[in-house]
Regions:
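Conserved catalytic-core segment of nucleotide-activated headgroup transferases in glycan assembly
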Residues: 1-2, 70, 103-105
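Short N-terminal micro-motifs specific to bacterial/archaeal maturation
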Residues: 5-8, 66-67, 98
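C-terminal alpha-helical cap of glycosyltransferases
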Residues: 100-119
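Donor nucleotide-activated moiety binding/catalytic core segment of transferases
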Residues: 1-33, 38
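Catalytic binding pocket for nucleotide-activated donors in carbohydrate/polymer assembly enzymes
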Residues: 30-96
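Residues at or immediately preceding the N-termini of alpha-helices
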Residues: 14, 73-74, 104
Length: 119
């Protein structure tokens, strides 16, 4: 169903939409790592959670995900209405050694050092 405040992101650059969004509803996509840097609320809508874990598996323990895990639409709506949030700081501390906004500089310096040594 169409709704003026819901964007179908199938053909959109998700990173451009991050700045416009207030929260993210995702499955266990790796997009949560990118979005977590923004310190915004996330919800995980996984109606097929048990099948997904059995068939595909998850690289990260789902208990570490920084948001409410919702197995049905009612849980998702309730989580949003109650503003149920996860421990975003703990998640970032586990997965990001550096959180100072200087990662690009570090990568450029690393590449420069590698190139300098190879000449």
């Amino acid at each position: 169903p169409q709704h003026p405040r819901i964007i179908d992101m199938f053909n959109e650059d998700t990173h451009e939409l991050f700045a416009l969004s207030d929260l993210l509803i995702s499955d266990f996509s790796s997009i949560v790592f990118d979005y977590s840097i923004l310190n915004k609320t996330m919800y995980f809508y996984v109606p097929d959670l048990n099948d997904y874990l059995k068939d595909v598996g998850c690289y990260v323990n789902i208990d570490l995900f920084p948001g409410k895990i919702c197995k049905n639409i009612d849980e998702l709506i309730q989580g949003i209405q109650k503003n149920e949030v996860g421990n975003l700081e703990a998640f970032k501390n586990i997965f990001f050694e550096y959180q100072d906004g200087k990662n690009t500089k570090r990568v450029v310096e690393l590449i420069y050092d590698i190139l300098k040594k190879s000449l």
